[in-house]
Regions:
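Sec-dependent signal peptide recognition
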Residues: 1-9
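C-terminal motif of bacterial Sec signal peptides marking the signal peptidase cleavage site
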Residues: 13-14
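Acidic/histidine-rich, surface-exposed loop or edge segments in extracytoplasmic proteins
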Residues: 30, 38-50, 76-90
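Solvent-exposed, acidic/flexible segments
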Residues: 37, 41, 55-63, 90-101, ...
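Glycine-rich, acidic and aromatic/proline-enriched surface loops and short helix-turn segments
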Residues: 64-74
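Acidic/His-rich structured neighborhood in mature extracellular/periplasmic domains
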Residues: 72-194, 212, 219, 241, ...
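Short alpha-helix capping/helix-loop boundary micro-motifs
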Residues: 195-207, 223
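Low-complexity, Gly/Ser/Thr/Pro-rich intrinsically disordered linker/tail segments
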Residues: 210-218, 222, 229-230, 234-305
């Protein structure tokens, strides 16, 4: 029986023992040594604040933040609205992986923000029409949704750049059908049509020198007579002053010359043809200028479900 008090004391001592100390947060110098896609949200928030404080030029900040993600693994169709909406379980942000749209949106949102909380708000302001979160208000269509609803951020200058060499294509968008078939969501939208200008691939070299860090790139593809924006990314300036394409594509985020990108696409086209598959061909590019003196508009109130 004398063992009982001893055992009781041991149990009490175990319950009252001090937990091990939490690991010390990294210094900003240590955080700066990590690629962005390996940072925790807390570290990313401190990195965002550091960039806002130490790089006042928005264009240079966009280029630096985008390059901080070089090597980030690529995953297609990465984000959704979970847990705000439960039509799928895809999250509303991702630091570890990206696709082309996710990479561009996260880079812009981080460059425009001072901390993690503002980044998350800014990301939704960019991803959704008027910043109202929902699968029906997400900017699904690059030309008619993303480019238009983010006119406060970027302006399409494709026709201006191309001049007499400008090309265009008609685009018809049926959002109701898209939401019903792709997201099992019923929503009523009118069918919309537009005429989209772009720079043909044969004339891209002639306009590259007019582009700046942070400008938005839409890659225009064609197949079976239809044209659409199949890929997006950012313009960055190389050390020699030439313009490169910073983008997320399998297997990872990379910075490459536009010549290298077009060669990579041409190789894919040749492979598709050799395999007897319908060939998705590169037609050209749309270029959207990052606006000067950006004023971020407020988001509309989130409606009650």
């Amino acid at each position: 029986m004398r063992l009982l008090p001893v055992l009781f004391s041991v149990l009490i001592a175990g319950c009252a023992s001090v937990p091990p100390p939490a690991p010390q947060p990294l210094t900003i110098e240590q955080i700066l040594q990590k690629p962005l896609y390996q940072m925790t949200p807390q570290e990313a928030g401190r990195y965002i604040n550091h960039m806002q404080t130490n790089e006042p030029d928005l264009r240079k900040r966009i280029a630096a933040i985008g390059r901080k993600n070089i090597g980030q693994p690529y995953v297609l169709n990465l984000l959704g609205e979970f847990p705000f909406q439960i039509h799928d379980e895809l999250p509303m942000f991702s630091l570890t992986h990206s696709d082309c749209v996710v990479f561009s949106e996260h880079t812009y949102a981080m460059a425009l923000s001072r901390n993690w909380e503002e980044f998350f708000w800014m990301l939704q302001r960019i991803r959704y029409k008027d910043g109202v979160i929902g699968v029906a208000t997400r900017n699904h269509y690059t030309e008619q949704d993303w480019n238009i609803n983010n006119r406060w951020l970027v302006t399409d200058i494709s026709a201006q750049l191309a001049g007499a060499n400008v090309a265009s294509y008609p685009l018809t968008v049926d959002r109701s059908r898209f939401l019903r078939t792709r997201h099992h969501t019923e929503a009523s939208f009118p069918v919309t049509k537009s005429d989209e200008a772009y720079v043909p691939k044969e004339h891209v070299k002639e306009v590259l020198a007019q582009l700046n860090d942070g400008d938005f790139v839409n890659v225009i593809s064609t197949r079976n007579g239809e044209y659409w924006a199949s890929h997006v990314g950012l313009v960055v300036t190389a050390p020699d002053g030439s313009r490169n394409f910073l983008n997320s594509a399998a297997p990872q985020v990379r910075e490459e010359t536009f010549d290298a990108f077009m060669a990579r696409v041409a190789a894919r086209e040749a492979q598709q043809a050799a395999e007897g598959k319908p060939v998705q061909q590169l037609a050209g590019f749309k270029f959207l200028r990052l606006n000067d003196n950006i004023v971020v508009p407020p988001a509309l109130p989130q409606p009650r479900p």
